[in-house]
Amino acid sequence: MESLVNKNIILGVTGGIAAYKSAEIVRHLKKSGSSVRVVMTASAEEFITPLTMQALSGNRVSTELLDVEAEAAMGHIELAKWADGILIAPATANTLARLSSGRGDDLLSTVTLAFNGPIALAPAMNQAMWRDSRTQGNLDSLIGNGFTICGPDSGEQACGDVGLGRMLEPIQILDIFSSLFDKGILLGKDVLITAGPTQEPIDPVRFITNRSSGKMGYNSVSYTHLRAHET
């Protein structure tokens, strides 16, 4: 993750059970040579304390949009100008909906609106919420607006369900996020990606197919759209 050296990174933490993994993300970012400032939503504070994130990042944690002290210097604009990149992990279904609609009703969403640079989201939610057509519509909108989606993973969830919706492990998220600062050979290239199952006819009646979920193609789109001229 050499591309993160000397980068100013905002880590957004929202209110999901996976918020505890955000502490490890801060640790990895610092180890990679990044300066980290953490922005937490009110619900995130129910899962992990600002004091923990402050101790790990070495910087004051921002939580309030209407913070009198911070807004004396237009805090949300100052944060947006300071950052080289924004990573929101975990990104709940509510967060995806808020960002997709362009709402700016808390500090994190307002900073995101004011920021002009790479933004990555690491979704974390129940598998039914992930499959919901409205969530998928929000994801399509976010990808269309230049957001990078990291994951999610499939497996057992905190509620006991099994399926897509688990947040990727911190190191997996950071592998994707760091690549946003290293455009490499795809810069200026047009990329075509296919996803999902295919069918190859054997005869007019029968065909060979596979059980592809499209997950690999979906993640490939997230990986390439900021590195290519058109994906």
Predicted regions located by residue number:
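Glycine-rich oxoanion-binding loops at beta->alpha junctions
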Residues: 54-88, 93-98
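Short, glycine-/small-residue-rich phosphate/pyrophosphate-handling segment
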Residues: 117-153, 165-172
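Short glycine-rich anion-binding loops that position phosphate/pyrophosphate groups of nucleotides
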Residues: 16-17, 67, 91-96, 125-127, ...
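N-terminal phosphate-binding or glycine-rich loops at protein starts, especially the Walker A/P-loop
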Residues: 1-42, 121-123, 206-222
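Glycine-rich phosphate/pyrophosphate-binding loop and the adjoining helix
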Residues: 154-191
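Conserved small/polar residues in nucleotide/adenosyl-binding loops
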Residues: 224-231
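A short, basic/flexible loop-to-alpha-helix module at the beginning of a structural domain
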Residues: 1-3, 178-185, 197-200
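Glycine/threonine-rich flexible loop motifs
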Residues: 94-104, 129-132, 202-209
